[in-house]
Amino acid sequence: MSRKFKIRVPVPSFAFVVDGETEIWYLEMLKRNERGINLRIKPEIPQKKGLDDQFELVCNLASSEYDRVYWIVDLDTIIKESNEAPTGVKTPLTSFFEMKTYLSDKLQNVQVIVNNPCLEFWFLLHFKRTSRYYRRCSDVTRELKKLLKGYEKTERYFTKRDNDIYLQLKPYL
């Protein structure tokens, strides 16, 4: 009698390129709570990287072992940097849209996710439908605090054992 071999189904692998700690904390909780998901968060150690560095990392990851690469960008940061840019110089916003266009045209396994203005707006959408425009992340955070009791933008809040940010938002997905 021959042995039966179980055919292994490959688990898709995902890489996330993020520019802030909030995104890293959320994704770490996703990974902790959804064990079947194979994802990597880049950079592993949060450091303020410019758009050019993030873009280069996205391109490198897209041509490596990952099935899908997600680049999560907070638009409020890009707009702030664009407003502070000297006149006559290409703004970070213009550069970002060029990068986004390149990625959508050339790399099919890359998804650019733009938070407008920040990730907290996406959290807010878990609780209520709104098309309201928020200029600043602080405006969104104020609204979010009404719906997520005790919300604070800290690692301690995001990673609480048995009540982390992912578990609080999951029922509203």
Regions found by a protein language model. Name each.
Residues 15-25:
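Catalytic nucleophile-elbow at a beta strand-turn-alpha helix junction centered on a G-D-S/GDSL motif
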Residues 17, 71-74:
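Conserved beta-strand segments of the P-loop GTPase G domain that flank and frequently precede/overlap
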Residues 47-53:
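Eukaryotic endosomal/vacuolar membrane-trafficking regulators centered on PX-domain-mediated PI3P pathways
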Residues 2-11, 24-25, 29-43, 57-68, ...:
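C-terminal accessory helical subdomains adjacent to catalytic cores in phosphodiester-
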